[in-house]
Amino acid sequence: GNAVDGPKFHGMSFQNGGWGLYNHWGYFQPTLSLWNAFESGDTRRDATIIYPGQTIRFMGRDIVFGSSSYSISSDTGMSFRKFLSPWEEADCKGKEVNSNGDNASNTLGTCLIRFADVLLMKAEALIWKNGEGDAEAKQLLNRIRKRARLPENSPATKAELKNQRRCELAFEFMPSRHLDMVRWGDAKEAYAKPTQRVNSHWDYDLQQVVIDAPSNYDNGRTFDPVINQVFPIPVTAFNGTVNLTQNQGY
């Protein structure tokens, strides 16, 4: 794409279409599993995900997600709010790029690393080196929990570390949730699980969004450790050499 147009990651990831206001693509959507991964009272949940019936600021309008005028096209019945609300269509300097949404660019930049990620990386190293319950790891994780308005009672277990990375860094281009699961050895099991979506409908009598029973949907995800444990070597790396062999399966 044209790099001077500004960040496109956010626009690519809001639900497909934009109610005739701006055309997004819906490439990445939160699952019900991610929604449920947040503890009760975790302020990051509503800052990360827009759930049916919630309001988002979009193209200068306050939109009730899933209402009669603003239906939901997302495969999971939800969409990402993080870095998106309020949505302002332009490049990173505020200049309009293309009002029909073909470029889906946003005034917001894309975070490549945050201080919270640094704290989580150190906590992970301490837990994996010294064992669960490490005192310094508890302090680091409690800093993350405090910011999310959660009790500062971290057990500093591997399970909590993994979940904190999932919740804190959801929908961030780097670090990648996929790469986390690969290096932990969790990717094959995670991708084999069915994906659940949130179902909802607009009740015209009540004039509100009503949440229905969730359902599974086929997301087409697979993970073969023999192939997907690593990425393919870029084609350009083979230029001028006969000593490289492409990774298996690519």
Each PLM stretch: what is its role?
Residues L32-R114:
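Flexible, polar/acidic helix-loop-strand segments at domain edges
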Residues K8, S13-H24, Q29-I49:
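An acidic, gly/pro-interrupted, aromatic-rich
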Residues E39, I72, M121, R177, ...:
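Exposed, low-complexity/repetitive linear segments and helix-based recognition motifs
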Residues F58, K129-G131, E136-K138, L150, ...:
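A generic "cationic amphipathic patch" detector
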Residues H24-W25, W35-F38, D134, P151, ...:
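Generic detection of long, well-ordered alpha-helical segments
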Residues T55-I56, G133-D134, H178, K188:
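Flexible loop/turn segments at secondary-structure boundaries
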Residues D42-I50, G109-I144, K158-E168:
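Extended, hydrophobic/aromatic-rich amphipathic alpha-helical segments that build helical scaffolds
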